[in-house]
Amino acid sequence: MKFRESKNFSLTSISSEIQDFWSKNDIFSKSFNKKDSSSFVFYEGPPSANGKPGIHHVMARTIKDAFCRYKTLKGYNVERKAGWDTHGLPVELGVEKELGISKDDIGSKISVSEYNAACKKAVMKYTAEWESLTRQMGYWIDLSDPYVTYTPKYMETVWWLIKNISEKKLLYKGYTVQPYSPAAGTGLSSHELNQPGAYRDISDTSVIAQFKCLDGELPVKLKNFYPFYFLAWTTTPWTLPSNTALTVGAKIEYSFVKTFNQYTKKRITVLLAKNLIDKVFSKNFYKIDNENELDLFNQNDTKVPYFILESCKGVDLENLKYDRIWEEAPLPVDNPENAFRVILGDFVTTEDGTGIVHTAPTFGADDYKAAKSAEPEVPPLQVLDEKGNKVPLVDLKGKFIDNIGLISGKYVRNEYYESDSIPDKSVDVEIAIKLKEQNLAFKVEKYSHSYPHCWRTDKPVLYYPMESWFIKISDLSERMFNLNKDINWKPKSTGEGRFGNWLKSANDWNLSRSRFWGVPLPIWSNEEGTEHKVIGSVEELINEINISIEKGLMKTNPYSKFNIGDMSDDNYDKVDLHKDFVDDIVLCSEKGLPMKREKDIIDVWFESGSMPYAQIHYPFENKDLIDTKSNFPADFIAEGVDQTRGWFYTLHAIS
């Protein structure tokens, strides 16, 4: 059999001919304008046009296109609305780099208005490249009427959703220890930390620190062992100066052990969980059966003997006092008399460490909860800054405050330094060296473990005390878990395995982001924080501003040219809901007090998860599309597996 050979065969020419044919004959729009055809609902995950498309976008779009074309050929109407994700950290960090500024410069070297204008310009930088790729690969998506997340209509729907959540009593303000990215200058939500690759294996300096027990109110059964040290293990030595408690398990058995400090060679008695003695006293130690053999130890010996004494239960240790380990650190500003004592916690285990947990309430979620639940409550180590505000020993840049000894003004992690100014010794190493010299370090060694990193800056996160607005996901987790069973995941293991199990114990959603370019939290509060007003629409905001004008809190209404009820784009172009506009608006509380907007913007993942509603300006327009379920929920979504903890999660949570 002979096959005809085309000598002038050109894939490029054929591609152009097909594209021209589709364009001239309006084939794409005809494909989803079939009368009396059932709809197949597809949601397009919005890319950001501030970066160029990559090969992974081609792969994802190929899968999307194949299924949508198949359903079209089966007779369905398959509308495919394009979208642009225009807010968030990727945009802001790119603009900061381009302008040669940092977050701290915004509001001083450059106004918030100028900064947001630069972000708005940058976010559509590569639109032409995206549209070109879309055409070249034959991906059918409606680029003529995309949803754009920075538009007033989209933002208004996001506000409406927040108000709706508030009316369901699922929105609250809380002061908690939460993931925080010093490099990005903002808090993070738990689902952001569960992005693939967020946890990375790193090697840190770990310390088993010696906390010297005070003899003030020792029970009779423990007096015979005085003086002794509590042994507590940490993989974050930089948190030791902020220690205010040691946590033990009430039912755990703890043993007193006589030995020598391997660095100072001083004789010491230490206390740790009985089940962990063999693990802690490994390598450079050996067990003896007669206490008198300790007298045979020579300071030049390479191996250190230890002798096990009697044991007690964790409950016997409750409220014992100890010497603070970092003398240069100030006392807590609140109730210092309740600090530096042993408390009980049900999270303490004997799987690793020493069975005694170093507790710094300012830098650990479990630490914070344990300190709060203790009676009396253990205070966090906070001091007053120059403005009289309570702050921890580490600032929002990840740097120690001044006047706390050799660590003053240093970053808690070397990754926070500029590449040309990284010190030879990290703060962890410096702290370990000092504790060795003071006979307060029992063991110092490298420890490999998994540690969370910011998904956008690739820098390690801190757990930091902050006030934020949360969605009470914990009240919804069971329903979310059960509804997840109705989703037809491909492969099943993706949704029903790790993701499904994660939903069972999902944490409350931290909405607050300390940034500038995004949808502002639509919450106004009085100075005392006792009254709050959540705004759910442009109309509501205009009406509230008019009340403020009547009460003398504002002179003019910045949105006076907006015509309520007119849903045209031209009318909505008269409104800007971004931070640089709404932050100047003062509302009036029910008691007649001035109310200012809460300073943060909304987590950009909430924006993208609002897409089913916001893309059609629900409920202000197209209300029937959602209410009749003709355009909700989606029949088909296809994205990378990383979106199980991103867009898929937020779509699920918001719905």
What are these regions (language model features)?
Residues K2-S13, F32-S144, V220-F230, P237-S655:
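Non-cofactor substrate-recognition interfaces
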Residues E17-S38:
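Positively charged, low-complexity intrinsically disordered leader regions
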Residues A117, Q178-L231, W238-L240:
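Active-site cores that bind ATP or allylic diphosphates and position pyrophosphate for catalysis
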Residues I165:
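Extracellular glycan/ECM-engagement signal in secreted proteins
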Residues Y172-Y175, F442-V444:
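Acidic/polar loop patches that form or flank catalytic/metal-binding clefts of enzymes
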